[in-house]
């Protein structure tokens, strides 16, 4: 819905160039149609992640952009991947209870949190990095600490260079430790590139649905909760649950 009027209208109101957003989406739509897998970013992503899950047990797919501006994009991907691929039945109606678990992260913040788990925890994850490779508005670290040997080497670099070095180092560390990862590189982060990313991930989800043999366009798993909510709120035609207490409940009382 992000590229439909539901998403485009509020984006335009907030100052986003909707035409550029759609232009980027159209660009991704074109190259994601090619039958040559090596030239189809969406198809390649879906295939690699499905193989990692089905053959290697890597059921957790981590999207980790190295940009604070893409933090919300990670959460958008989490919603897209989860609601589209987590299904009880395959296309033939067989009970399968399948689907990968998406996990949002952001660099460099999660290098000092989740990467510990990615490096040394269960071999059940694939990390998908998003790297900004072009020239961005950047800040030079500066040489005002040149007299301090432990940080003097940073004087000729920028914060962007430092972040990118940390991203490349993290990817290499994961690789050396046998942890699967892939990287999408974008030159800049603007409306056109964002539209391209939205479309690329959306098409990858459709391809993944075919590989998992599920319908990625329905969301039956959320319907029961909606209907029970209607019943609890008194909507006509809907009944509240017979019991409202959870199986286990802890109550924290004020002292």
Feature map (PLM): residue ranges:
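Short alpha-helices
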Residues: 1-26, 161, 165-168, 179-227
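Active-site phosphate/pyrophosphate-binding segments
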Residues: 1-128, 133-137, 221-255
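Glycine- and acidic
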Residues: 29-32, 58-66, 95-100, 149-156, ...
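Short secondary-structure boundary micro-motifs
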Residues: 37, 45-47, 156-157, 167-168, ...
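N-proximal short alpha-helices
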Residues: 43-46, 50, 54, 143, ...
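Helicase-primase coupling helices
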Residues: 97, 103-189
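Extended, charge-enriched "interface" segments that sit outside catalytic cores
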Residues: 143-154, 211, 242-255
């Amino acid at each position: 819905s992000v590229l439909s009027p539901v998403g485009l209208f509020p984006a335009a109101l907030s100052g986003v160039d909707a035409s550029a957003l759609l232009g980027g989406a159209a660009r991704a739509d074109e190259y994601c149609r090619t039958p040559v897998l090596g030239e189809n970013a969406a198809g390649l992503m879906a295939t690699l992640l499905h193989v990692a899950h089905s053959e290697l047990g890597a059921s957790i797919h981590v999207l980790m952009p190295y940009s604070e501006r893409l933090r919300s994009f990670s959460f958008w991907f989490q919603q897209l991947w989860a609601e589209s691929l987590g299904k009880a039945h395959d296309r033939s109606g067989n009970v399968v209870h399948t689907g990968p678990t998406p996990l949002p992260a952001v660099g460099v913040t999660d290098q000092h949190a989740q990467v510990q788990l990615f490096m040394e925890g269960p071999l059940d994850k694939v990390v998908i990095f998003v790297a900004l490779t072009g020239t961005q508005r950047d800040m030079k670290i500066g040489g005002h600490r040149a007299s301090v040997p432990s940080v003097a080497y940073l004087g000729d670099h920028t914060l962007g260079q430092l972040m990118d070095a940390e991203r490349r180092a993290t990817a290499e560390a994961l690789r050396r430790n046998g942890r699967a990862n892939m990287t999408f590189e974008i030159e800049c982060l603007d409306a056109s590139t964002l539209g391209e990313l939205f479309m690329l991930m959306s098409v990858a989800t459709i391809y993944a649905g075919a590989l998992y043999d599920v319908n990625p366009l329905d969301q039956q798993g959320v319907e029961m909760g909606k209907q029970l909510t209607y019943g609890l709120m008194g909507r006509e035609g809907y009944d509240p649950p017979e019991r409202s207490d959870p199986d286990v409940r802890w109550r924290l009382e004020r002292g």
